[in-house]
């Protein structure tokens, strides 16, 4: 093999290596774009979990269930009993029930959908506990809720102080919505 052929072979091998490196880098960039949305939710009965799964499917976001350190029992959720755990927690707006789990590397998310059922006209205080665990400055925070008949009530009034420097959107009522309807709601935010 002549010396010019060797040079050409070396240059071609170098060009192929550069091309493969560029393709691998582009693939990494595309993967990181896909993981910029988090769908965090608290669901006592499963209704909000269903809505969260639809939001995650539409957005391509990662799902995170906000789990109470002490799971709620049926008796805890009895809103007719003023002494039930949920009634006591919701009567004290400063109540912060402990959360069992956390989100690793929350910094990688630009947009966080936060789902919950409406309890007493607002989000359950465990959602405040979740928000207060992290520095969410500059992140887009999109509350969504489910309810047996209530509207958003004063949800934002009580959630915003838990992440005061977040870019809050209006809460979305996703109760009983199909995935197509959820997609319309999510796309209306853009």
Label every model-predicted segment.
Residues 24-110, 121-123, 132, 179-190:
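N-terminal beta1-alpha1-beta2 submodule of the flavodoxin-like/Rossmannoid cofactor-binding fold
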Residues 106, 132-138, 162-163:
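Short, conserved loop/helix-junction motifs that constitute active-site signature segments
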Residues 116-117:
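Glycine-rich, N-terminal phosphate-binding loop of Rossmann-like dinucleotide-binding domains
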Residues 142-178:
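Short, glycine-/small-residue-rich phosphate/pyrophosphate-handling segment
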């Amino acid at each position: 093999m002549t010396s010019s052929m060797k040079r050409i072979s070396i240059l071609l091998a170098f060009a192929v290596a550069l091309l493969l490196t560029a393709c691998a880098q582009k693939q990494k960039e595309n993967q990181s774009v896909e993981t910029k949305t988090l769908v965090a939710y608290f669901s006592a009965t499963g209704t909000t979990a269903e809505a969260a799964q639809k939001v995650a499917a539409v957005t391509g976001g990662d799902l995170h269930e906000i789990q109470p350190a002490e799971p709620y029992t049926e008796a805890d959720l009895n809103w007719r009993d003023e002494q039930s755990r949920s009634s006591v927690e919701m009567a004290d707006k400063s109540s912060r029930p402990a959360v069992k789990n956390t989100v690793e590397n929350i910094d990688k998310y630009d947009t966080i959908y936060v789902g919950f059922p409406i309890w007493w006209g607002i989000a359950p205080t465990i959602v405040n506990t979740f928000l207060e665990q992290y520095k969410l400055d500059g992140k887009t925070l999109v509350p969504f809720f489910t309810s047996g008949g209530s509207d958003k009530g004063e949800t934002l009034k009580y959630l915003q102080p838990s992440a005061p420097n977040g870019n809050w959107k209006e809460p979305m009522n996703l109760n009983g919505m199909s995935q197509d309807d959820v997609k319309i709601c999510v796309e209306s935010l853009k």
